[in-house]
């Protein structure tokens, strides 16, 4: 479980405090504040050129973990197989089992820089395969999938008519190239549940806020589970997240730079040892 070593930026905290002072302590709509969903849609457009209908294709969840859980529960029938690259986040396997699915593990290899290859994916697909979980950028390996890697995966996904759950919670923490979402490829938005949140990019782990973007037919089923199990994500957190989305780009960039400096500091002795 990733925990940023930064505090939530003050202007984001202030917005949460202000919402309490203004008495905004009631339920929001089940799917989340309209203002927040609008900002999420704008963020995805400016960052990745992806267009989502805030009213029909975006919902706010209690962290990305809830989004993973309800996506699996909404999509799986008993015995459906879910391909899960490992190592990765601890929740994928138990959530699959709880939803009645069967986890199928693909061990990522160091020689492939811990990226999933089309050959590895193809090798584990069966007639029961329904979903591919894409945990990239990856925790704990730090692996990313570049555009060419994703193109090969997309081809296999389409050939076998699979759905994808793309956990992109670390999308802001790449240090060389920008993150590429698998949902941005032609024909993939219609078969992808994109999951993201505020914990890593904005150092908001304790605020417990994430979101899911999906085709309307899938999102409707996810929302049914969410509204009866959760009602809505925390109201105070949602107002703070609006501020994060509107004015948090500089904070994200500063934290990314600090993480990158730490990466350089840790990796430099290893590089020097390899040279010597």
Enumerate the language-model features and the residues they cover:
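N-terminal small-domain helix-loop-helix segment of the aminotransferase-like
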Residues: 1-63, 70, 244-247, 253
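Short acidic capping loops at alpha-helix termini that bridge into adjacent secondary structure
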Residues: 52-58, 78-81, 128, 189-192
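Conserved PLP-anchoring active-site segment centered on the Schiff-base-forming lysine
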Residues: 74-96
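A short helix-loop-beta submotif of the ANL/AMP-binding
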Residues: 97-104
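Active-site phosphate-binding strand-loop segment of PLP-dependent enzymes
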Residues: 104, 109-178
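Conserved core segment of the aminotransferase class I/II
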Residues: 185, 189-260
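Single conserved hydrophobic/aromatic residue that forms the stacking wall/gate
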Residues: 264-276
């Amino acid at each position: 479980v990733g925990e940023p070593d930064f505090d939530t930026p003050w202007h984001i905290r202030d917005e949460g405090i202000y919402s309490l002072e203004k008495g905004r302590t009631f339920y929001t709509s089940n799917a989340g504040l309209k203002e927040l969903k609008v900002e999420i849609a704008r963020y995805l457009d400016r960052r990745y050129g992806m267009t989502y209908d805030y009213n029909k294709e975006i919902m706010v969840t209690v962290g990305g973990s809830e989004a993973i859980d309800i996506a699996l529960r909404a999509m799986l029938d008993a015995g459906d197989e879910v391909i899960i690259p490992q190592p990765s986040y601890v929740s994928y396997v138990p959530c699959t089992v709880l939803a009645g699915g069967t986890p199928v593990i693909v061990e990522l290899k160091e020689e492939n820089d811990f990226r999933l290859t089309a050959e590895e994916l193809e090798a584990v697909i069966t007639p029961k395969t329904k979903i591919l979980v894409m945990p990239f950028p990856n925790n704990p390996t730090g692996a990313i999938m570049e555009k060419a890697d994703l193109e090969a995966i997309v081809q296999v996904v389409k050939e076998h008519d699979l759905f994808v759950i793309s956990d992109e919670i670390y999308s802001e923490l790449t240090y060389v190239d920008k993150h590429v979402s698998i949902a941005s490829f032609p024909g993939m938005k219609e078969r992808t549940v994109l999951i993201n949140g505020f914990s890593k990019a904005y150092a908001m782990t304790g605020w417990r806020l994430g979101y899911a973007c999906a085709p309307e037919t899938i999102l409707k089923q996810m929302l049914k589970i969410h509204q009866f199990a959760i009602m809505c994500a925390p109201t105070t957190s949602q107002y703070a997240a609006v501020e994060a989305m509107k004015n948090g780009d500089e904070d994200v960039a500063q934290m990314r730079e600090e993480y990158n400096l730490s990466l350089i500091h840790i990796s430099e002795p290893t590089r020097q040892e390899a040279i010597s």
